[in-house]
Amino acid sequence: MSAARQAIASARSVVVKIGSSALTSLEGGLDTTRLDRLADAVEARMRAGSDVVVVSSGAIGAGLAPLGLSRRPRDLATKQAAASVGQLALAHAWGTSFARYGRTVGQVLLSADDFSRREHHRNAQRTLDRLRSLGAVAVVNENDTVATEEIRFGDNDRLAALVAHLVGADALILLSDVEGLYDGDPRKGAATFIPEVRSSADLDGVIAGSGGVLGTGGMASKLSAARLAADAGVPVLLAAAEQAATALGSGTVGTAFAARPVRLSARKFWVRHAADSRGALVLDDGAVQAVAQRRRSLLAAGITAVRGRFHGGDVVDLLAADQRLVARGVVEYDSTELSTMLGRSTTELPDTMQRPVIHADDLVKV
C-alpha cells in the first residue's frame, strides 16, 4: 500500500465530500437508501476513532421534484429557489439517517466569502471544531441561495478541499459517480485507470471532462481540488460512492493523490487559494522571472500596468505581458499610489514608497 493510502486509512481527521449524483436520482429527489449507506460508512469511520466532516452536495437536485421541475435549471434564480427547498430536505435526510446511531447533525452553510475573509474563516473554523468536539456530525454545503459565481464552484469539490484545510484534516475523500482517475473518458471507449498520483507528472495526458446530469463537478474540478488539498499537505482519495465503505475503511479503492512533501504555510495557502483577488499587476519579463523563478520581492520598476482598485493589504494577481497568471500576492500599496510608481527604480521613489510592492514572503507562484 502506498504512503498516501496508508495516511488516508489511518487519518484521525477526515473530510468526506459526497457529490450530487451519489445522493439524488435521475427522477429527482433524494435517494434515501443510498444516503443511508453513505451515513453507515461515515459512522463506521467515526467509531474507528476518526473525526469526520461531511461536505454534501445535492441541495439543488433535492429541490427539483418538490418544485415540479424535471431537470436541473440553468438560470441562477431557479437554481437558488431549488437550493432553498432542497437544503431543508437534505438536512432532514442526513439528520434522520444519523439519528439511527444516536448522532446529532449540524448543518453548516458556507460561501467563498467565508474563506476569503479572515474573521469569517475563524468563525467557521471554531464552529466546525466545536461540533466535532461535541460528537456531532457537521454536514457542510455551499450556501447556494446567496451564491453567484460560487454556485458553479465544481459540485463542492473545491469547497471540500478548503474545508479540509480549514479543519486541519489529515485526509480528504471525494465520493462521486466515478471510480477514480482515468487517462480518458471510460464512457466513450478504452481508458486506463490511474491508481496513484504522486506528482503532477502523473497527470500528463489525463483528459478532464464535465460532470453528469445532476452534478456540476467533472473530473477537472476534482483534479483542481486534489491539487488544492495537496498544497495544504492533505492526501486525497477519489472513489465511487458505491464503494464508500471500503474508501472510508481500508482506502484500497479509487485513485490516491499524494500530498506535497512541504505544505504551504497557512498564509500562503490563503493567498493562493482562498483570498479574493482585488486587482492585477502586469509585469515585464524581468519581473516575471524574478517573482516566478527566483522568488524575489516585486519592485515597482518591473510593473507595467495596474488594473482594478485595491488597497494595501489586498491580494492581487500578477500577470505576464501575455495575460498569463504567474503569481498572487499581498500588495503593500493602494492602486492609486502604485499608478504613480510604475517603472520607477526604488532610488527614484520617496522614502515612504521604497518598500517592495509585494514582499517575497507574501508572494505565491501559481
Curated annotation (Swiss-Prot):
Q: What is a single Pfam family found in this protein's UniProt entry? A: AA_kinase
**Localisation per UniProt entry:** Cytoplasm
Q: Could you say which EC number(s) this protein's record lists?
A: 2.7.2.11
Record domain PUA: where: 278-352
Among CDD domains, the record links this protein to:
AAK_G5K_ProB (cd04242), PUA_G5K (cd21157)
Which cellular component appears as one GO term in the record?
A: cytosol
Annotated ATP binding sites = K17, S176, D177, T216, G217, G218, M219, A220, S221, K222
What catalytic reaction does the record list? Answer: L-glutamate + ATP = L-glutamyl 5-phosphate + ADP
Q: What are the entry keywords?
A: Amino-acid biosynthesis, ATP-binding, Cytoplasm, Kinase, Nucleotide-binding, Proline biosynthesis, Transferase
Q: Which Gene3D superfamilies match?
A: Acetylglutamate kinase-like, PUA domain
From what superkingdom does this record's organism come? Bacteria
Any single biological process term in GO: L-proline biosynthetic process
Q: Name the pathway it acts in.
A: Amino-acid biosynthesis; L-proline biosynthesis; L-glutamate 5-semialdehyde from L-glutamate: step 1/2
Q: What does the UniProt function comment say about this protein?
A: Catalyzes the transfer of a phosphate group to glutamate to form L-glutamate 5-phosphate.
Record-stated family: Belongs to the glutamate 5-kinase family.
Could you tell me what this protein is called?
A: Glutamate 5-kinase
